[in-house]
Amino acid sequence: MIIKPRVRGFICVTTHPAGCEANVRQQIGYVKAKGPIADGPKRVLVIGASTGYGLAARITAAFGCGAGTLGVFFERPGSESKPGSPGWYNTAAFHRAAAQEGLYAKSINGDGFSDDVKQKTIDAIREDLGQVDLVVYSLAAPRRIHPKTGEVFNSTLKPIGKAVSLRGLDTDNEVVKDTVLEPATQKEIDDTVAVMGGEDWQMWIDALQAAGVLADGAKTTAFTYLGERITHDIYWNGSIGAAKKDLDQKVLGIRAGLAAKGGDARVSVLKAVVTQASSAIPVMPLYLSLLFKVMKAEGTHEGCIEQVHGLFADSLCGSAPHLDEEGRLRADYKELSPQVQARVTALWPQVTSQNVRELTDLAGYKAEFLRLFGFGIEGVDYEADVNPDVGIPNLVQA
């Protein structure tokens, strides 16, 4: 079939298999051009491995460090008549590229919050790798079924303590408008922490340790975003921020548990990028459109693969990691540089529906959004007939 983009709000409901493959190949090309990463991990588990930062971590581990990788995700395959999800095609492309280089790659498709997927992951590590020396936690999901109680939690994007009026951008209609968000209830805050906080990361590491599949000296990191003042009401000071603070608490226990065998656990802070998750957050499309404009002018603009490659080379595997006073690894320092934030803050109140194209890089934001779904990528023939039914070799279906 011939597949065209169909965007509804913050989701594109179609995906292009060849475009996703080209996008993955470009990221692999970037990592390979940078050369091997010294002292990199060789057996890597990525939880949330199919899109965005998790995919970038898998690509960096494999093609920058020469690592065998095991990826966990929850994606939808395509059929002859309907495209699958982007992460499905990204993973199929990754597997093909890894096989060409003789790199081990296996994936598990299922609910990463579940005990079943954790057990299948442990079984795969035991059978194929023995142990892993790096665990990347990059799971982004709106809901979680608790594996012990069966309780269902839904995350909420709300401020805490007071209603907040936020400037936002309707990217479909290119209209700048204010949105009032009512404060989260305590249950909504608790549920968001249950979905997006550190409990599941802790459960993963506990399960891997108990099974003996973590190597001595193993490291783990969970990816997060903190942002600056403009996004703080909805982010750091909101319901999501409560989950981020929980991550900062949970990492202390995980770190102590791994330190006994020479290991380490860190939260890694990455810059704001266009992802399916961030596009759903009020404020973020406008903030990102401004950030793109300012950082491109400065020559410091980066996407997922540049960020994660830098994190691996400088901090996860480097001898002088970028640490903040909380002990987090920081890769977001270019975004948070005073001159970038001052420029974004100055432009923020000036943007209107009339000048949004001129003051921001809305075109760049929209192009980046479509790239997530395999569209607008140079070298891809979008008039060609493609088969959306693409298989993933070496896939365990949970």
From Swiss-Prot:
This is Enoyl-[acyl-carrier-protein] reductase [NADH]. It comes from Variovorax paradoxus (strain S110). Monomer. Keywords: Fatty acid biosynthesis, Fatty acid metabolism, Lipid biosynthesis, Lipid metabolism, NAD, Oxidoreductase. Pathway: Lipid metabolism; fatty acid biosynthesis. Signal peptide: none annotated. Substrate binds at Y225. It holds the Pfam family Enoyl_reductase.
